[in-house]
């Protein structure tokens, strides 16, 4: 039996114990993990330092290094995230709906654990902790496979998690870590039908495409974020600028950052120069359509590929659109279905945008950066789904459960 298959088998056995534990036992385990992460903080930071050194030698981009980096504050943030999950309502056992049939059968739809969840992800070590916290609270075991660039960090984090679990009723085997740089381990995970109930990829477009195309285990596709901000002719100029700067510049290397700006031609000449000046002072490279190049000298002409690119860096594609419909058509063609925002004071235009744009999250007069489990009140998230089955948008505890039908009778048989 291969190592990956053996890990999944151990997780499946442990999941049986986890699935029947009550909320108090699960919360106690999460608190123990949080305490152990704080106790092991220096060890974790030292391990992360090795990964950062290796990443710099490998020439990782600044955005990837930012995703990879851990600090004392970021570890504290992980711990705070766990504590928030502790406070969240346990979805397991929740009765979603009930009804009675004419023959007297009482039927209830009840939330149950997923079972064993496989997580394949890149760079971000915080995903290790967020995933474990959410999966354990939702009653599922987890098999983790992070990227080789974060191997030392993930190894230290999983060690702390397992040490925390050793003090609780939850078996250590509920958390398994594929401690290998072999990319073949990912392919093996994707074919573990009967052992893994679900695989969630979280990373760049290449990783997600590879998982979706090769998996025989069910997959929830988390999103590449080619997000747009559309500044309508009826937008408040100051509000539009503030939203744009937040959506693009607050943090470049995240999937809910804006990658394209669409501006109605009715305000482009007056509004764009000031907006681009603000972007330039923050080091953002502009790639514009022909109309943008006419309005602003020195702007790089956008290539067709730029409209479909998730830059994850200080680069922004800007297009002047002739009207609202032109903006909708552009978003329809290039959106990855993650997060899309309109800035306008016209309520009818906003309503049409929110109705017609096909994305996991649509915004009116707000930044795309809010597409996040914490911001939505879910606590830590396992990812942001851009598909429509089984979950969409930020995936919290409820999205990590399934359900079953509990049917009670008094001796009924089918005629």
Swiss-Prot record:
InterPro entries on file: Ald_DH/histidinol_DH (IPR016161), Ald_DH_C (IPR016163), Ald_DH_N (IPR016162), Aldehyde_DH_dom (IPR015590), G-glutamylP_reductase_CS (IPR020593), Glu-5-SA_DH (IPR012134), GPR_dom (IPR000965)
Pfam families per the UniProt record, alphabetical: Aldedh
Catalysis: reaction(s): L-glutamate 5-semialdehyde + phosphate + NADP(+) = L-glutamyl 5-phosphate + NADPH + H(+)
Origin superkingdom: Bacteria
Compartments reported by the entry: Cytoplasm
Molecular function terms from GO: glutamate-5-semialdehyde dehydrogenase activity; NADP binding
One Gene Ontology cellular component: cytoplasm
CDD domains: ALDH_F18-19_ProA-GPR
Keyword NADP applies: yes
Gene Ontology biological process: L-proline biosynthetic process
Pathway named in the protein's UniProt entry: Amino-acid biosynthesis; L-proline biosynthesis; L-glutamate 5-semialdehyde from L-glutamate: step 2/2
Keyword Amino-acid biosynthesis: yes
Keyword tags: Amino-acid biosynthesis, Cytoplasm, NADP, Oxidoreductase, Proline biosynthesis
Entry's EC annotation: 1.2.1.41
Protein function: Catalyzes the NADPH-dependent reduction of L-glutamate 5-phosphate into L-glutamate 5-semialdehyde and phosphate. The product spontaneously undergoes cyclization to form 1-pyrroline-5-carboxylate.
Protein family per UniProt: Belongs to the gamma-glutamyl phosphate reductase family.
The protein's name in its UniProt record: Gamma-glutamyl phosphate reductase
Native organism: Desulforamulus reducens (strain ATCC BAA-1160 / DSM 100696 / MI-1)
């Amino acid at each position: 039996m291969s190592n990956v298959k053996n890990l999944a088998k151990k997780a499946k056995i442990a999941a049986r114990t986890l699935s029947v534990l009550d909320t108090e036992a699960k919360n106690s385990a999460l608190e123990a993990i949080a305490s152990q992460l704080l106790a092991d903080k220096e060890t974790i930071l030292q391990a992360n330092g090795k990964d950062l050194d290796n990443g710099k030698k490998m020439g990782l981009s600044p955005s990837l290094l930012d995703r990879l980096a851990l600090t004392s504050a970021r570890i504290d943030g992980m711990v705070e995230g766990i504590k928030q999950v502790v406070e969240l309502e346990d979805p397991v056992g929740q009765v979603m709906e009930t009804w009675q049939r004419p023959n007297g059968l009482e039927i209830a739809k009840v939330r149950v654990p997923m079972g064993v969840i496989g997580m394949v992800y890149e760079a971000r070590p915080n995903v290790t902790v967020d995933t474990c916290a959410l999966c354990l609270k939702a009653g599922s075991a987890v098999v983790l496979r992070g990227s080789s660039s974060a191997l030392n960090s993930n190894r230290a984090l999983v060690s702390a998690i397992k040490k925390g679990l050793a003090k609780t009723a939850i078996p250590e085997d509920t958390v398994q870590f594929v401690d290998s740089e072999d990319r073949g381990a990912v392919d093996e995970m994707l074919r573990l039908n009967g052992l893994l109930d679900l695989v969630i990829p979280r990373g760049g477009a290449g990783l997600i495409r590879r998982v979706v195309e090769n998996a025989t285990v069910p997959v929830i596709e988390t999103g590449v974020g080619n997000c747009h901000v559309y500044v309508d002719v009826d937008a408040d100029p100051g509000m539009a600028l503030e939203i744009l700067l937040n959506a693009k510049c607050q943090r470049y290397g995240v999937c809910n950052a804006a990658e394209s700006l669409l501006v109605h031609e009715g305000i482009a000449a007056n509004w764009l120069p000031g907006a681009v000046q603000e972007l330039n002072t923050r080091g953002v490279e502009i790639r514009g359509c022909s109309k943008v190049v006419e309005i602003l000298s020195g702007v790089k002409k956008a290539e067709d590929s730029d409209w479909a690119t998730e830059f994850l860096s200080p680069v922004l594609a800007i297009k002047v659109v002739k009207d609202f419909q032109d903006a909708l058509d552009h978003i329809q063609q290039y959106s990855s279905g993650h997060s899309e925002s309109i800035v306008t004071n016209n309520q009818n235009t906003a309503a049409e945008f929110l109705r017609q744009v096909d994305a996991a999250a649509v915004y009116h007069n707000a930044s795309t950066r809010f597409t996040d489990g914490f911001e939505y009140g879910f606590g830590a998230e396992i990812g942001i789904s851009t598909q429509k089955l089984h979950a969409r948008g930020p995936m919290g505890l409820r999205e990590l459960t399934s359900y079953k039908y509990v049917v009670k009778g008094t001796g009924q048989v089918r005629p």
